[in-house]
Every structure is written in C-alpha cells, then in structure tokens.
C-alpha cells in the first residue's frame, strides 16, 4: 500500500514510529506537510500538489494534524477523501473533536458521562453561572486551549469570578466545569482503535499541579481499566466518528467522566508506559479497513 502521513515534522516520535511500522510491513510511506499543499478543486479530477508534485496513487492517509492548523489540515484531508483515499480519521470527525463545545454537546446527546459544564461568552450573571455547575472549586478553560494551556483551577468563588472576568476582558469564549476532587489530579488516557481500547495509561499531575498533561510534567504509568471505563472510551470515540482517538477520562464517584477526545493522540507516552506497539496496531488496522473504503462521508462532510 501507499500510505501518506499528514505531519509537519517527520522527526516527531509519533510520525517516526508510524513510518517505521508501515515500512516494516512493506508499505510505501510519504510524509506530507499539509500547510505546504495546494489543491486543484474541480468537478472532474480533484488534485493535491506538494512541492511541485501531483500527489496521487495513495491508498490511505494518516492525519497527524496539529491543533493550530486544524482548518487547513482538514481541508487537505477532505481533498484526499474526495480523491477516494481512505482516511484513518475523517476530516469531519477531526473537526468535531477539535471544537470543544461541539464535542461536549455530541457526548451529551449520546449520554456519555462528563463533568457538569457551563459555556459562556459574556455572562451577565457570573454568580449564577458558577452555581449552575455546582459552585467553586471549578476548572475554567479557554475554548481554544491545548496541552493544558488556558486551563485554570479556581478554588474559591472570588477567584473564579476574577478569572472569568479576566477571560471576558480578552473577548474569549470560556467553559466552566465542576472540579472532580476525587480524581486526585490524575486522568486516564485510553487509546481507542476501531471499536476497542487497545492501551491505557494513568497520567498523574506533578505535585502542586492539577493538570496531568505530559507536556506539563505529568507522569504516565500502566493502568488497568474497568469494563465501564472501556465502554465509555469507545462510546466517546464513536460519538465523534473517530477510528483512532485518545480519550481522557476522570475517575469520579459517579463513574468515568470524559474530559476530552483527541483525534491525534501522541504515541510516545502510551507506548513507553504500556510497552505496546501502538504504531504497528494502527498500520494493521489500516490494512484491514482501507480496502473497504469504510468512510462514512467520503469527503461529503
């Protein structure tokens, strides 16, 4: 098979591992920087050009699209879909998961457990907004933040009001979520592939920090998840329409709660924590599904 990987840096761990796994199985691999692509959009023969070359003959494409280039990256991926190339994750599914509000609304519609969440732009009654989610302490998030950036724990009502007013001054849309104290600064990253959780790790925030992101110094260890957690992670990925997803769960007194569904989950932390060949499993999945062209929208979304 000829497999394309949409990535801006072939030296990144996840990209490098996918290349190694694909080549080890005899596939031809080409890494493409989506931002450097340009497209010929027409009714007869849609094309993608890259460094003067017409990209054609691909059987599958693996999108590793960074959050900052979601719009253009998904546009290029959609063009691949229109050309009949199998996407591991569809453009419309990635777009859903990158919109934090939309993704939570989709999870809500499907009845997937998640923290009580308020969404606001210019609330005229901040006190009522806080009471709506159960009062302080609360977690306040910028809608566009990633890797723990733009996430604040406000431990008192006064602090929460100050943070919300500051974010309002930036003309930013914000989410206000209940703080799950019993999680103890830890979350669980479930790596979903197809309709299965193939690996899971526990991420623990460093002392004095509540954000467990590995980019913020959190540590990762192997964890055994419950059947309910497994079911919740798969349901969350399915709600987005993702074949490959990193689903972040919190363990709460009322069961697993989904914090986020990531469409380009990193491989380094979870491969090291679990000792599993996640990259190889992704390529195996492509081998089994690409020939069926099993996409829901085929670029129509």
UniProtKB/Swiss-Prot annotation:
Mn(2+) 2 binds at residues 260, 262. Gene3D superfamilies: 3.40.50.20, ATP-grasp fold, A domain (3.30.1490.20), ATP-grasp fold, B domain (3.30.470.20). Its cofactor is Mg(2+); Mn(2+). Mg(2+) 2 binds at residues 260, 262. Binds 2 magnesium or manganese ions per subunit. It is an enzyme of class 6 (ligase). Mn(2+) 1 binds at residues 248, 260. Residues 104-287 form the ATP-grasp domain. One of its GO terms (biological process) is SOS response. NCBIfam families: PRK10446.1, rimK_fam. Belongs to the RimK family. This is Probable alpha-L-glutamate ligase. It comes from Pseudoalteromonas translucida (strain TAC 125). The lineage of its organism: Bacteria, Pseudomonadati, Pseudomonadota, Gammaproteobacteria, Alteromonadales.
């Amino acid at each position: 098979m000829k497999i394309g990987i949409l990535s801006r840096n072939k030296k990144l761990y996840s990209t490098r591992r996918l290349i190694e796994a694909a080549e080890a199985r005899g596939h031809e691999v080409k890494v493409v920087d989506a931002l450097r692509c340009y497209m010929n959009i027409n009714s007869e023969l849609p094309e993608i050009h890259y460094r003067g070359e017409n990209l054609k003959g691909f059987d599958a494409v693996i999108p590793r699209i960074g959050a900052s280039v979601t719009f253009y990256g998904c546009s290029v991926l959609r063009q691949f879909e229109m050309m009949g190339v199998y996407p591991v994750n569809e453009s419309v599914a990635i777009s859903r998961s990158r919109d934090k509000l939309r993704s939570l609304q989709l999870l809500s519609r499907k009845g997937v457990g998640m923290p009580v969440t308020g969404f606001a732009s210019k609330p005229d009654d901040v006190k009522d907004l806080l009471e709506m989610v159960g009062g302080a302490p609360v977690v306040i998030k910028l809608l566009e933040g990633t890797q723990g950036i733009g996430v604040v724990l406000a431990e008192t009502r006064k602090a929460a009001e100050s943070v919300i007013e500051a974010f309002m001054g930036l003309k930013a849309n914000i989410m206000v979520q209940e703080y799950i104290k019993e999680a103890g600064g830890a979350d669980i990253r479930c790596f979903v592939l197809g309709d299965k959780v193939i690996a899971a790790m526990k991420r623990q925030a460093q002392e004095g920090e509540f954000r467990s992101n590995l980019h913020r110094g959190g540590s990762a260890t192997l964890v055994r998840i419950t059947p309910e957690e497994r079911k919740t992670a798969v349901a969350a990925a399915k709600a987005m329409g993702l074949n490959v997803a990193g689903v972040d769960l919190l363990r709460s007194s009322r069961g697993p709660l989904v914090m986020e569904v990531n469409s380009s989950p990193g491989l380094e932390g979870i491969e090291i924590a679990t000792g599993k060949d996640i990259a190889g499993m992704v390529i195996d999945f492509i081998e089994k599904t690409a020939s069926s062209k099993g996409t829901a929208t085929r670029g129509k979304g």
